[in-house]
Amino acid sequence: MGHRLIHGASESCALPHGHNEFVTVRLDPTSLARLDGRGNMPVSFQKAKQTWHRFVDERLDHALQLAGDDPLLAWFKTHEPARAARIVVTPGDPTTELMVCLLMAKINAFLLAEGGVLRCSELSIEETPTNTVSFSGNPEEMIPAGRSPEACWWNRADMSISD
C-alpha cells in the first residue's frame, strides 16, 4: 500500500510512497471449549480467513492511505472520484502504528459478525524488512477519539475503507 504522512513525522514521508507490507494476524477463540473429536477446530481456516482475505485483496491491495484532512484527498474527490473510493482514510496520518489498530478493529468487526467464535489477539504489519509494528490489546484504546464508534469504517463488518 502507499501512503503519505503530512503532519511532520518525517519530511521524506510527506510525498506519496509505498511499501510492500505484510500483515500477520493471530486469532484466538473467544471461549475455550474442548475440541469435538471430529473437526477439532472452533472454525475452519477457510471460513475464518475468507472475509478478511477478500477485504485485503479487494480493498487494501494497491490502495492509498491518506489522513482525513490531507488536501490530496480533497483533490481526488473533486478530480478523480472513482479513484477516491480506493483511498483508505484515517484519523490523522496513516502511520503503521495507527494502521495496526485500525486493521485489528476491522478484522474483529468481521469476526464478531460471523458469530464471534474467534477474535484477533495480535496484528502485525511488516512495512519493510527492518520495520515491523505489532499490536495486542484493545485497539479502541489507541485509535484517536472524536467520533462515535458506529460512524467509523474500521468498526463496521463491511468492505468500507473510508466514511
Predicted segments with their positions:
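Charge-rich, low-complexity N-terminal segments
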Residues: 1-163
